[in-house]
């Protein structure tokens, strides 16, 4: 609709205005401006009260909407709307329609509904154009007699009026299609109603019709007929003439049968005949072939017609609440049936043909008498099968059985057979007060009503409750009934007693009672006990208040529903006390003294064992006297009965505390939620008052509590980085922490926090903090006061202290066998209880514990008690809920999680409140004596419903010291296993977990084939690595670190990991674990680190499963360790995480068994809060040689990690990944060692140049701090060092011989972590080539093992001596790197900026030291007898000469040549030098043999060739290092001219960016006997002649191994920007002297391999100088 906004000079030709829902109170003025053009005006849903006269000038209106207004008068001017077609004035206050309405001749649609009209004007029938007229709810009492003049009417709505008759002229409305007469007072319909030929819908519901005229059968076009809610007793047979009828609604009438003609309604689709009096359904119903919905609810049908099977289109059949006794087998013909509801009938069996209804999805047979279901129903695809009224789940689990009567296979479940429920006609017949309790009202209610029952059986307490209208609801008790409870508590103190039963019931009455109670039990297993005459009966508790609809559905709920509330179950049968005090059901019950004929109702709950005390144990005579007087009081008087309630074990304050409002337990240390206070509606025995003692209803001795005194303390806490270590609760306006006190209380104290060390305890009331009073403060004020208190917090607290009563009775701790049996009265007027031994089926044993309070407290937590969440469902006792590791309770070893606390320091705790127990435990007493009750192996209590929470989680056997005498500790285990288990140093326990279908809540690690680190490092096994906080294992008392010895008797000490998992997952009703309480890993603790917004965590990790070991001291350890802590991250700021710690869990996610990548991903996904469980890992002091700077573990490329996965074994958690992601990193790592896949037998391969980026190498640690694990390459396979890198610590600068690098097949000793001793000469490699390769100064290649016996012969063609100068010059040219066209890829930062700065500082310092040292050595090493060769020798050569040269002989096993003496000042670089050296050796040690004499001439020539090659290589290296030094001088000079040098550019670079080499890393491919290729480093070409003449300078060591170069190769990612701009920049690295562990089998030189060198020559020829 167009809404016109009147603007200046706007177009006023507006045809439609919509002002609905505009809250208009008057008609807008602008509407009048459009009087010439406006045709549609909608003013509905406003607040118009009148229509002004200008309104009726809108003469062109065709549609007017005025509904939902407050118009009180329709003016006669409405006649002006001559062109009006549609008028809607519904839902106004118009009392009458003006007579002038007749002039609106064009009116076709009129709606006057919802107005207080009482009549229509006489001229109304002149509106002959009217087609749709609505007069609903207008209080019409009669229609105009000439209503037939409205000949064009199509729709006439007259619902909700006061019509009692219809005019005969109604039949003239020949165009009428819809007539609605519902909700009137019609009693008779005119016969002329059948003369409406076009009528399609006729609504006659909610009238007073008692019959329908037969003429209705003439309405041939009628589609819908609704005559529901009338008084029809029968239908006319002519109704079958309605050939087009589809909907026939006959609900709520008095029909007793359906006419036979109903079968003629071939188009009938919906037939509703519910709430009638049908006794049968005609067989003609089967002819309604299109019938899809048939509703026959609430009739008197006893059977269904057999023709029902013809209804092939029937989808919904509802026959609820009838008297059906059998279902016709023909129902299987309803193939389209999807919903079949047969609820509340009398069906005893279902026909198997029902399975033919293939589309059946919902079957409701609740409230019948079915014994079983036909097995054929399994063929149906049922979505819901309802067997009971309150069935919790739509589908159940069925079992197959054989029918005892027919022998056929049937389906059954726990809801079958069904219990019959009374029919509805019995609902009004209430039982009289004298009838049995089984005749309870039948209507199901949501509460248990305490109503009139047998007077002789009704307690006074229950009578009082009934008079007050008390309704007992499901536990927990609603808070709104607390006030009502106080009234009952007052009546308890008046010692109401029960009236004795005047006469015992007859056996027939007993049978009725038992049968009624059996019906109430709803599916429980019947007991075999029978009632015997003359013996007192104990009837089920509170049956009076339980309707018969209540118990069975409740049982169904608890069995099927996933969540089960704590329930109270009722005893099904009478419990007959026997002589030994045990009931027929096998549960120990007290044989209480019941008067003759007295019948008691016992509430059967979770079995509890009576805490009786023996008379012999009472230490004081007044306690004995009080006990005897209490018994006499019970027996006094002719009507003395047995009292029914528990005695409150507290002094006068007990009632006040029980009547307190529901309070919320805010003690976070116990971790228990809130619940309402437990309630027992039983009377209290009025025992005489004896100071110090009292009694409960069974005359059990109860010790009164100690007196509570309050003291004020002033404590000072020094705040630390982690806070104060306390939590507070309460405050003004908050939920009180204790009672009604709105003060601030300490709710939690961290065990090792500053507050605990200062003496703060849980329960202290906070009065003042640093002078700020907190008595009436709100919670947030207290929080702000604590936060702003500064470093030293001085607080004033109020603490409660227990003072023992004057005549307190102290109880001797009971031994486990001193459990108490029920008492019986024998002899005369007063009989003492007979003490009998406990029955052998006892599930519990008692033991005493005495704990000495430490500075950290007692070390355990309690849960349960009144006023707190029950630790176990339905059990209000106090239990040990947690034992702190290392606390007093843990060290004592006498407490276990789940132990019930019976008394604390002699004060009974069986019915105590939670806060009382806390007060006793936090008292000032240094020692605490506990009497505990522990569940032991044996029969279990009645199993709770599945998934009930929480349940008694396990039955934990006591340790040997507290076991029951004469009872085997672990009966399921073999004696050998038990003996072996008990021999260990740690306690062994058997823990049983009831399997209820849910998870165990634990994870294991270890096994004979898996590492179990950090558990059992020295003694591997299967360990519990994770326990879910509230899982089944945690409730059983299992802890992290427990060693599993056996699972259900199966020994798993030597089992594999998978076998242990299979044993734990094996289906069984109960899982019994034999565990040994091994101590947890040392240093295990949980740390919480908070990250600031945008702050990085700042740690790096190493290790992981299926990768490189993160523990350098143990290569088998697959744990995750912290390898670096950045001082700028959150971890460095926190200060508790340090290098070497092992990570066990991150945010409750275990890291055990995760790969390195998974651990990195998990750590990177944490939010702002990191909760990490750590323990001690490796000692960083033993791996100091691996560190390049403080707090940084050495780079894996330099730390002897020589594995392909070295790159993947250390990751920074805060590293920004490249766009390529981890896949790119893995690709780089996978390309690191391509030479491994090459054949070692390929010869003549060119060693292509290796391009090393200067920046990448300069960022690596210097050789002075470089640790290289010794490695030997054999046959193309890299072998690991025989010992850990940390075991090789020698002076920097000394090149270790090859003796430390052993192949795996060598006899070198391999000990874990042991020192690597130098080998003996016999253990040296036999191959001469291998020996020389170990010390060659040029990089060589390793021949395969099968070439050991083939010494190389010099090839003359390839000899460097035969090459020209220019050909030799090519070896010394540096290759110019051509920049790549494409842009550099994204760098991956491997070294942080702070680490790079530390490396550079350390490098500069070491270079300074080396320069000074070399200058000093140069003067010493120069001598006159050096000759020409010595002129070129440098201190580097002397260092090499100082090494013990081992020259092994041929494979024959000859001893190596003697090494030169240490400290010799003549390096062996020439033949003359060697002769001089040998002369000195002969002079010093004449007995040394000459190994060369044993060599053949060919071998001697080969050896000489090797020596010469070695010497030439040393000279070439000296020249090359001089050239490098010169280049550095040039770079320094350029730096003075404003250009930056490589070191400065490296320092400014954010991270070392390795440069990718265009050549594959096949430079180090293993070849049979290829010449050593020179490895040119990328840079610009420099002519050898340009720098060969430069003066010799201090050389730079560059001793590396091929695998080291290979690792460096993986660093290459992109050329550094500007790296090619500088003159003289070469890709070299200043590595200083090698580390002790850096045994380089070859040296990397600066030579270029431009051509193949023939095999057999190991070096270069002499270079002309």
Curated annotation (Swiss-Prot):
SMART domains: LRR_BAC (SM00364), LRR_TYP (SM00369), PDZ (SM00228). GO terms for biological process: activation of GTPase activity; apoptotic process involved in morphogenesis; astrocyte cell migration; auditory receptor cell morphogenesis; auditory receptor cell stereocilium organization; camera-type eye morphogenesis; cell migration; cell population proliferation. The modification Phosphothreonine is found at residues 378, 475, 674-675, 812, 1353, 1555. It is a peripheral membrane protein. Residues 422-615, 635-689, 1213-1246, 1263-1325, 1341-1501, 1530-1577, 1632-1665 are annotated as: Disordered. Residues 455-475, 653-687, 1390-1421 form a coiled coil. This is Protein scribble homolog. GO terms for cellular component: adherens junction; apical plasma membrane; basolateral plasma membrane; cell-cell contact zone; cell-cell junction; cytoplasm; cytosol; extrinsic component of postsynaptic density membrane. Residues 714-801, 848-936, 990-1079, 1086-1180 form the PDZ domain. Residues 452-463, 657-681 have a biased composition (Acidic residues). Ubiquitinated; targeted for UBE3A-dependent multiubiquitination and degraded. It comes from the Eukaryota. Residues 479-494, 570-580, 1213-1228, 1364-1376, 1394-1406, 1471-1482, 1534-1547 have a biased composition (Basic and acidic residues). The modification Omega-N-methylarginine is found at residue 1312. Expressed in CD4+ T-cells (at protein level). Found in a wide range of tissues including liver, kidney and spleen. Also expressed in the brain (at protein level). One of its GO terms (molecular function) is signaling adaptor activity. InterPro entries: Leu-rich_rpt, Leu-rich_rpt_typical-subtyp, LRR_dom_sf, LRR_R13L4/SHOC2-like, PDZ, PDZ_sf, Synaptic_Scaffolding_LAP-MAGUK. Interacts with UBE3A. Interacts with PAK1 and PAK2. Interacts (via PDZ domains) with VANGL2. Interacts (via PDZ domains) with LPP and TRIP6; the interaction is direct. Interacts (via PDZ domains) with TJP2. Interacts (via PDZ domains) with APC; may mediate APC targeting to adherens junctions of epithelial cells. Interacts (via PDZ domains) with TSHR; regulates TSHR trafficking and function. Interacts with ARHGEF7 and GIT1; interacts directly with ARHGEF7. Interacts with CTNNB1. Interacts with MAPK12. Interacts (via PDZ domains 1 and 3) with MCC. Interacts with DLG5. It is found in: Cell membrane; Cell junction; Cell junction, Adherens junction; Cell projection, Lamellipodium. Belongs to the LAP (LRR and PDZ) protein family. Residues 1-804 are annotated as: Sufficient for targeting to adherens junction and to inhibit cell proliferation. Scaffold protein involved in different aspects of polarized cell differentiation regulating epithelial and neuronal morphogenesis and T-cell polarization. Via its interaction with CRTAM, required for the late phase polarization of a subset of CD4+ T-cells, which in turn regulates TCR-mediated proliferation and IFNG and IL22 production. Plays a role in cell directional movement, cell orientation, cell sheet organization and Golgi complex polarization at the cell migration front. Promotes epithelial cell layer barrier function via maintaining cell-cell adhesion. The gene is Scrib. The keyword Transmembrane does not apply. Residues 714-1180 are annotated as: Required for interaction with VIM. Pfam families: LRR_14, LRR_8, PDZ.
